[in-house]
Regions:
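Bacterial N-terminal signal peptides
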Residues: 10-20
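C-terminal region of N-terminal signal peptides and the immediate post-cleavage residues
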Residues: 18-29
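Beta-rich, blade/repeat-based domains predominating
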Residues: 35-52, 77-100, 117-132, 139-141, ...
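Short loop/turn segments immediately following the C-termini of beta-strands
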Residues: 57, 96-97, 137-138, 200-201, ...
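Structural signal for beta-propeller blades
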Residues: 60-63, 100-102, 140-143, 203-206, ...
Length: 319
């Protein structure tokens, strides 16, 4: 399915569209952790014990902290670590820009590279078969690392590409001058086995069905283009098959229901360029969303760190 044609908008309308969304969010956001540069978190994940993992790209490391605990370094990397996800056994997988995918054993120890390549590796997700997928945001593609260790292109649909032109809010994404086009970003699977992909520059969610043989089906636009999805970054799913999106350049958290309808849950301070979300795992935390507040391109006065909000629906915390 091709993208709908994008109409230009006048600057006054653009600014009104961006600013008006701050009043739409109804869920309160609280602060869990405050950090300072270079320790600004881009991706976030939680394990079954409630330990939180953060990628700190400008410090070239991944750290973790238990509830109420201090930051502990998990591993350092040769370049910027972005996406962080855990498998059901607690092994930590990290997407490293220009390097590939790295794994840190659940029991601890040095990180080992399990897939290599020059992409802008970013979002990670496991399917129900245990295969690991990663987005190449710069190349606009999804790659798969299967259980045999084979690393291959899974989908190169044009819908996964980014752009250097203005997005759905009428503005160029703020990261484009530094990193170039940013297409496929956060990824997650719905209950039907379809992959949902955040397209950062275009403010879209792309749906890619999985064929019976595990190959990628034909990609289509599931939601957007929408100003409320501009800067769509990290994503996560709840048990009702809703997709949660950290819209970084909008400074907000969105919920996209199974029909593609977008609801703004939270916007404005303290959210500042939020880049990823993870559902809680502990007792009383299953409906909690933990947010990596990247603040690399500030959208408010909110400091970098970790924030928390309640989604009202239990999430899928692992993978």
């Amino acid at each position: 399915m091709s993208r709908p044609f994008r109409f230009g908008v006048v600057l006054a309308g653009v600014l009104l569209a961006i600013l008006s969304t701050t009043a739409l969010g109804t869920v309160s956001v609280t602060r869990v952790l405050t950090t300072s540069p270079p320790n600004v978190p881009e991706s976030i994940a939680t394990d079954h014990r409630g330990t939180t993992y953060l990628s700190l790209p400008f410090a070239s490391k991944v750290v973790k902290f238990a509830p109420g605990g201090a930051l502990v370094t998990v591993a350092t990397f040769p370049s910027f670590p972005l996406g962080v996800r855990l498998d059901p056994e607690g092994n930590v997988f990290v997407a490293v820009v220009g390097s590939g995918i790295w794994e840190v054993p659940a029991a601890g120890g040095p990180a080992a590279q399990v897939a290599g390549g020059p992409g802008l590796w970013n979002g990670l997700a496991f399917d129900h078969r245990g295969n690991l997928y990663v987005s190449d945001s710069g190349g606009g593609a999804i790659w798969r690392l299967d259980k045999n260790g084979d690393f291959t292109l899974w989908s190169g649909s044009p819908l996964l590409k980014g752009t250097t032109a203005a997005g759905p809010c009428g503005l160029v994404h703020p990261a484009v001058p530094s990193f170039g086009p940013l297409g496929a970003n956060g990824i997650a699977f719905n209950n039907h086995g379809d992959m949902l992909v955040a397209n950062t520059d275009f403010g879209e969610i792309i749906r890619i069905p999985t064929n019976p043989d595990g190959s990628a089906g034909t990609a289509s636009v599931f939601s957007g283009p929408a100003c409320n999805l501009w800067g769509a970054d990290g994503v996560g799913m709840d048990n009702a098959d809703n997709l949660y999106v950290a819209a970084n350049s909008k400074g907000q958290i969105d919920r996209v229901d199974p029909t593609g309808h977008v609801e703004v849950l939270a916007a404005g301070d303290p959210l500042s360029f939020p880049s990823d979300i993870a559902f809680g795992t502990g007792r009383g935390d299953r409906t909690a969303i933990f947010i990596s507040n990247f603040a690399a391109f500030p959208t408010s006065n909110g400091a970098p760190g970790v924030l928390e909000m309640d989604a009202g629906i239990p999430g899928r915390p692992i993978g």
